[in-house]
Amino acid sequence: METLDGFAREKLDALEAQALRRRLVETDRREGAIAFREGRRLVSFCCNDYLNLSQHPDVKRAAVEATGKYGTGSGASRLVSGNHPLFGELERRLADWKQTEDCVVFGSGYMANMGIIPSLVREGDLIIADELSHACLLSGSKLSGARVAIFRHNDIAHLEELLGAHRGGAKHCLILTDGIFSMDGDAAPVEALAALAAQHDAWLMTDDAHGIGVVGHEGRGSSFMGERKAAVPLQMGTLSKAVGGYGGYLCASAPVVDLIRTRARTLIYSTGLPPAAVAASIAALDFIRGNPDYCKRPVEKARSFTRALGLADPVSPIVPLILGDAEVTLAASALLEAEGYLVTGIRPPTVPEGTARLRFTFTAEHDDADIARLATLVRERIIQRRAAE
């Protein structure tokens, strides 16, 4: 008879053999891009706090003041008595910024997608998702009971083919995609997706976790990257990346948001976010709206890095360097850490097999000299050495 501990050890040993075991490493983040690990001062290039707002004095002050006024927790589900006044203020500001009628805030982005998708589609309906969509979009899709089809990454022709083949047999159809893809940093063709969705009577939902605050007109996100706002009826995103706090949201029409508040199990059965988290997001959003030029800095920093390496200009603060092998990727990450740079290696199943990578993320406060030195290290110690092997 196999014991629980024996089962766990066997699985861990198998993961270790493939260089796929995960470990938590205590990381002390400070102002700017500085982090401390095991007493060592490192420059972090693997943080999603793109605008460094988690350390902004106004944002921290708002969190402290909200705690003093409302306490450390909301005390209940939002639908019971946990809907403190700050929720409404944040939701109104998000809806106004994203140019929608209403907004609902969740405990996290993952919880948002796990609640939204099953609230909109179910058995007899169809979901078509980009193959590189975030895990929570795919998990929410499976939970819904709807039929799920996958289209090749950013391949509009393949999506149209799947719509032609399967849309007629489904009552409702939901198209899912990241706005900015978290592991590759590229953007979805949102305007083309919106046009195709309208043509086939489908609903388009974008997960803009890595777009809000850093791409699009005034940092409004991927739906605003074109000359005019794309017709995306379901704009989902997070408050934990460029906003610097915690939580998720959906901006949509008033009837849709009302339905989500009524049906989303991850909202109904979860305690509301603490007042401090909501207040911090309000303050961060105020900063973002008042400083559009500052919001451009993460992408500008990323471009200075790629140009030093002769790579294509990125559209987001995310720059992947695909190395393929998990062990090679871990070794490259360790090499950079020994030189004072924190760049985490990303391995399967987070990314597809054979695409393990270093994922560099850039923030508004990264020092240009650090970026230049990092680029030199990557070029001479990783790229050129691999080319010579």
Swiss-Prot record:
* UniProt record, GO biological process: biotin biosynthetic process
The catalytic activity, as recorded, is: 6-carboxyhexanoyl-[ACP] + L-alanine + H(+) = (8S)-8-amino-7-oxononanoate + holo-[ACP] + CO2
Needed co-factor(s): pyridoxal 5'-phosphate
User: GO molecular function, one example?
Assistant: pyridoxal phosphate binding
Its annotated pathway reads: Cofactor biosynthesis; biotin biosynthesis
Chain residues that bind pyridoxal 5'-phosphate? G109, Y110, S182, D207, D208, A209, H210, T238, L239, S240, K241
> Which CDD domains does the UniProt record give?
KBL_like
Q: Which UniProt keywords apply?
A: Biotin biosynthesis, Pyridoxal phosphate, Transferase
EC number, as in UniProt = 2.3.1.47
N6-(pyridoxal phosphate)lysine modification sites are: K241
Q: This protein's superkingdom?
A: Bacteria
Residues annotated to bind substrate: R22, H134, T350
Q: What is this protein's function per UniProt?
A: Catalyzes the decarboxylative condensation of pimeloyl-[acyl-carrier protein] and L-alanine to produce 8-amino-7-oxononanoate (AON), [acyl-carrier protein], and carbon dioxide.
On subunit structure and binding partners, the annotation says: Homodimer.
Q: NCBIfam families recorded for this chain?
A: bioF
Matches recorded under PANTHER family: 8-AMINO-7-OXONONANOATE SYNTHASE, CLASS II AMINOTRANSFERASE/8-AMINO-7-OXONONANOATE SYNTHASE
| Stated name of the protein | Putative 8-amino-7-oxononanoate synthase
